[in-house]
Amino acid sequence: MNFELSEEHLMIRQAARDFAQNELKEGVIERDSKCEYPEKQVKRMAELGFLGMTVSTKYGGGGMDTISYALAVEEISKIDNSCSVILSAHNSLACWGIEEYGTEEQKEKFLKPLAIGKKIGAFCLSEPESGSDATQQKTTAIDKGDHYVLNGVKNWITNGLKADIYVVIAQSNLDLGHRGINAFVIDSDTNGISCGPKEDKLGIRSSDTCSVIFQDVIVPKENRLGPEGFGFKYAMKTLEGGRIGIAAQALGLAEGAYEMALEYSKQRKTFGKPLSQHQGIAFKLADMATDIEAARLLVHKSAINKDKNLDYGYSSSMAKLYASEMAMKHTVEAVQIHGGNGFVKEYHVERLMRDAKITQIYEGTSEIQKIIISRKLLK
């Protein structure tokens, strides 16, 4: 395995780092506190090409590989995880499946405006009664001949209120179980679609999360993604790739917390010497640095597997499991190293700690990742 990043990768990483430092850092505490959606920053991500990174140039995207995408998510996550999850959900959950499984007509109509950031996408899978178990879809899309009628409620939808385009997973044939599930791509302004209030969350507070309600929504047959009954597989393959983005997010926020803790430990003095000179603190920093590097290797391996068209479901689950657990552990340690200062918003690390928790939950909980990994091991 080649551990060296190419010149192109280094340039992409630097561009994302510069954007995060120069355009995201200012105001990030206030946006988090007010649950304020980063309108200006999302527009800039579109202008810089971050909202269509992996979409082929044919459809207006950057045509970049998954490593490039992971590097960008990592750098942005060091500063603003709300922006990184907006980026991740748009690229991994909305754009990817349309390009992979959509018709040329669907790509022209829906993917192109997503790839250039003219429109924002959202993925509607989770429901009030089915989070981890995606086979139990209560939202229905009943075949009426030349169209489907969509009814149901989706919740925890990232970009829900701001999205122009929804990818929706729904049950069309209860008798067939998960083989009766379909995937659809729908304009958010279609009659019968409404949104619940923005969720007041523990972390990633300036990102947009809400319920989306579908009431007698008419969906043309040409809006179905993939063949009849393909929806469950569509959702699972989408999540496999999405987990690489979440793992990169966890890696980035852990690294951001580590860098802040390292710098603080060198400046803060106790008992006549810097905190970093106390073995208890130095050992914490050593553990953080080692675990971050291990997570990076897992993230990059899963990204390389995806780019080489190898089976990446197993490696992406490992990357997400390890990176998210590591991020939660070490953001707590970063707060501890900061002492009382770590408990106030001014020092950023408390926000990263709050942001870390969701990486253990969305796009498959840590427990779900262990199920996926253990099934592969015991197959």
Where are the regions that the model predicts?
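Alpha-helical interface subdomain recognition
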Residues: 1-89, 101-106, 113, 117-118, ...
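Short Ser/Thr-interspersed hydrophobic loop/turn segments at strand-loop and sheet-helix junctions
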Residues: 49, 73-77, 170, 186-191, ...
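Short Gly/Pro-enriched turn/cap motifs at secondary-structure boundaries
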Residues: 114, 129-132, 156-159, 173-175, ...
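A short, Trp-centered hydrophobic/proline-enriched beta-strand micro-motif
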Residues: 117-125, 169
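Long, acidic (Asp/Glu-rich), low-complexity accessory segments flanking structured domains
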Residues: 215-233
